[in-house]
Amino acid sequence: MVKTVANGKKKPQKVVKKQQKTQKKHNQQKLQKRNTPTLKQKLKKESKIVKINELAWKPVEIPDNFGDFGGFYGLEEIDGVDVEMVDGKPQFVVKGEEGEKSVSNENTTTNELEDGDDIEVDEGEEIAQQEQENSDNDELIEEDAEEVEEQQQHGEKELEEEEFTGFGDDIAKEEKDSDGAKKKLNSSEDIDELKYNAFANLDLPLPNDDEIDLPEWGEDKIETCLSPYILNGLSNMKFTTPTPIQKRTIPLALEGKDVIGKATTGSGKTLAYGIPILEKYIQSLDTVKRKVREKVVNHPTGIIFAPTRELAHQVVDHLNKIAQYSPLSTKGIVSVTGGLSIQKQERLLSFGPGIIVATPGRMLELCQNDQELVKRLSMTDIIVLDEADRLLQDGHFEEFEKILELFNKNRPKNDKSIEWKWQTLVFSATFSRDLFGKLDKQQKQKSVKGNGKALNKADSGNSLVQNDEIIELLREKLRFKDKAPSLVDANPKEIVSGQITEALVECGPLERDLYLYYFLLMYKGSTLVFANSIDSVKRLVPLLNNLNIPAFAIHSSMIQKQRLRSLERFKDASEKNQTAVLVASDVAARGLDIPNIDHVAHYHLPRSADVYIHRSGRTARAGKEGVSVMFCSPQEASGPLRKLRKLVASNAANNKNQKINVHSDVKLLPVEMDLVSQLRPRVELAGRLADSNISSTATRKENSWVKQAAEELGVEDLHDLDEFEDDIIKKQRKRQESKRLDKNEQKRLRFELRELLANPIRKNNRRSYLTSGLQNLAHLMVQGTHHEDVLGHEKVKALKDLQKNGSKIKPVKGDDKMKRIAKVNQRKQAKKDAKKDAKQKRQELRHGHSNKSEE
């Protein structure tokens, strides 16, 4: 179409098309402005204060490759919420659309209507602006009325088309609103997920019995007592054969009887009490469903008490693996331990989990703060004591006794659906008379009758108490339901697992580091080293790291997060490297199931026999073999070692009149002294560096503490405080300062240590020829059987080396050999002391002469 302007000239077609494109583009911009919120809309969205229970907390999904995620358990998060402190109390403020989504029961229909009204007002304003701009554009169009009308009609058609697309945007908006409603619905579902996840799988269909093949579980009629859910979990976990303790205790526990179970470490005691609890819960599914419909919080089926936090979390993991195909989901098994958020644990307990694994301290704290919680927990069906010997001593029993008293007082007496007393299951690897004597001080001097005969002092040498005595001691404290609880001893003639090979390394008291390094260098694998003090643990870790051996620490002074991180790092290092070491105090001696522990090394002899048994039980688990090595000085061999071996070996005797061979099961570890002499300079340098690091750290902490105390007391001159210090403290400080090294000295020692570590150790000091000596090194290298760190030595394993070359300890009357070694060491020490005294006297004389000359 040809268009004309006012002066009669024809307007080019390109100009007309350009104007049409400009107008179309402007209309599109107008539609885009409709969807953008105005300042008025933003100001209308007011902040709202909500309660913490109304927020849509979402559980954080932790990937499997993160392990325990730095020690966080049951972490939850919330988005779009601000926290403001008003009068010392937190207030949760919700702002914007994201904040509205963070509220669980929020209805935002009124806000959406208000936003719609704002959109209509804004649309009218934009249309007026558009008409004004169109009037400016009309000045460039010709005066021909028909053509102007045609252009206007054309523009209206374009507007109608744009408005049609705008209608499509409205539809899209409605779809978006519907998606938002779905998101709100999903968010509400996420809110209730934590609450109802424990009952989400109640209608789970039964597995097919034909797919489950566990013939050995059916030998003792255990399979007929178990549901297909549990059998399916056992089949998938490859637990095809029940252990002796499981065969004998599971049927008794399923019958509702009180059970006292004793078995060696690593024998499957967790499943021995875990399977009956899971079965009890599955049998009560109908009651659980009814209470869920009535919105009544269920009482727990079982409460398991563990002495340590790590053991409690480990029990939860094991039960979750077995229950992964059962109606009880992972949120139905809850751990209640110290070191984690108590508010989080209160919220989890308010949802009614089926199984609770707790430490006594945190459980008592929760029960004292919430009476309703005590009433619900007191209705439990089963109470389990795992590692009972530890749980009933060292202050744990006072807390546990208070919990039992609260449960007894609050347990309903007239409820027919609940038995008058809960079922009690007690499991441990050791039941010693000395340990149980601490429970009842009044009976320390009294004899407890068993089998109609009074026990006298002559029988006190046995490591285990008689069966009747165990029941008598436990009955008064634990208040069993049955008059005669069933006692099951799966290993009556074993106190240490038969899969553990016990060994001994004879060394001086100051040579433990040297022989420990020799053991770790010669025998590759993962090793758990136990020490009696936290200071020794802190010293050994840097010493081994200086020797290029990856070492990690775990002790009671570490917070829970640090302990779990050390365990995860040790597991990762043991998978990547041939040698990994975890140095621990006795906090890791009980219950922990750390996979693939090849050796357990006792850097110090334990203070009691039960600790030695549980320490050694960290290896040779689940039917595997392991090695337990003791580093013993002559002073320890003459006293503590003999008592320990007598206590352990006494239980292996068939009858009381049989002669006990104290050293029958202990072998001497073969030690090559030529290799030890080459390793000595390395250990000395690494020890000096480790001592320097520890002393500087201790001095730094002490100085910071003294400065802080002086500032609080207003003391300016710190030198005056030295006059009031004790002489012992001054000596300790001088001893620490003497071990400190300056930076240049540390650099020099580290350089020397690197040079020594770079040079390989050579067997028999061989230097030149690969084929010389008794061992053909070239042949070993071709076959790939040579030792990586010792030239001329083949690869060896501690277990095989002990079986081939390990010699049994010959008990010489009076231990003449040990006494001779002790005398030699005493003479050497006496000579050193005499030299020091003579040196001090010479210095005093010189100092006295110099003072006289000055006068």
Curated annotation (Swiss-Prot):
Region called Disordered, residue ranges: 1-43, 95-167, 801-855
Task: Give the family from UniProt.
Answer: Belongs to the DEAD box helicase family. DDX24/MAK5 subfamily.
Query: Mind telling me which CDD domains this protein's record contains?
Result: DEADc_DDX24, SF2_C_DEAD
State the source organism's domain of life: Eukaryota
Q: Where is the composition biased (Basic residues)?
A: 8-33, 820-830
Q: Which reaction is this enzyme known to catalyze?
A: ATP + H2O = ADP + phosphate + H(+)
Q: Where is the Helicase ATP-binding domain?
A: 250-449
Q: Mostly located where?
A: nucleus
A Gene Ontology cellular component where this protein is annotated is:
nucleolus
Q: What is this protein called?
A: ATP-dependent RNA helicase MAK5
Domain Helicase C-terminal span(s) in chain numbering: 515-668
Specify residue ranges for compositional bias: Basic and acidic residues.
831-855
Short sequence motif named DEAD box, residue ranges: 386-389
What spans are recorded as compositionally biased (Acidic residues)? 112-150
Amino-acid positions noted as binding ATP in the UniProt annotation, renumbered to this chain: 263-270
Q: What does this protein do?
A: ATP-binding RNA helicase involved in the biogenesis of 60S ribosomal subunits and is required for the normal formation of 25S and 5.8S rRNAs.
Gene3D superfamilies registered for this protein in UniProt: P-loop containing nucleotide triphosphate hydrolases
Keywords assigned: ATP-binding, Helicase, Hydrolase, Nucleotide-binding, Nucleus, Ribosome biogenesis, RNA-binding, rRNA processing
Cellular location(s): Nucleus, Nucleolus
UniProt-listed GO biological process terms: rRNA processing
Return the EC number: 3.6.4.13
Which species is this UniProt entry from? Answer: Lodderomyces elongisporus (strain ATCC 11503 / CBS 2605 / JCM 1781 / NBRC 1676 / NRRL YB-4239) (Yeast)
Q: Where do we find the motif Q motif here?
A: 219-247
Q: Which GO terms describe its molecular function?
A: ATP binding; ATP hydrolysis activity; RNA binding; RNA helicase activity
